[in-house]
């Protein structure tokens, strides 16, 4: 995550940063991570009695997303009808849902291409307001 945040153009809008970040992240996952490993990670998160690492708010993933979304709300790029935390939850749920479905389907479709088609619809709602 930190590597991606370091290469994203700081002059991009938050909308475009999120599109870029998601595209690059999902491409990396699709091309370098074994789908069975991803399935194992997700299943272990459901049954663990300990910390659920995918939900740890101090992860760099959440820090970067919170900063990006907060900045977009403050600048008026995203409508302020939702809090940064609410939009962060929606965005993170979106990514987890796609990753879960991709793993469930054994990676039989392009995760990157599918997300490239769907994510703009989610982000449009951030702009228009929920």
Predicted feature residues:
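Hydrophobic alpha-helical connector segments
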Residues: 2-32, 84-91
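Hydrophobic alpha-helical bundle segments that form small-molecule/ligand-binding pockets
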Residues: 3, 7-12, 47, 59-87, ...
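Short secondary-structure transition hinges
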Residues: 23-66, 77
